[in-house]
Amino acid sequence: NILGEEDDKFWHDHKGASINAIRNTTLIKNADILIVKFGDQYRQWNAAFDAGMAKALDKPIITLHDNKLNHALKEVNQAASASCRSVEQVVNVLSYLIDGTLEKQSLNVAE
């Protein structure tokens, strides 16, 4: 623990969140594009917060999530420059942004 041990879980989490906020804010400020991946667990709240920060900093956002989260993330997707449902779509968007490549890329990823 960087800031020392805590017996109380609240203060343990508070200290960790404070350090993470510094790290995440710095990384987002230095990013050209933010790719935000949402899942089924509580961490999607952190992802939504990071997306909001990126939007406030006028950073382009690409979201990545399953179709079952479409409704829950409709406002986040509206704020994003692109909303993807697969890693392959994210790669295709980035390929187009970086070198103008429009042809579909094929990934050899173990599922």
PLM feature spans:
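Conserved catalytic or regulatory cores that recognize and/or transform ribose-phosphate-containing ligands
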Residues: N1-E111
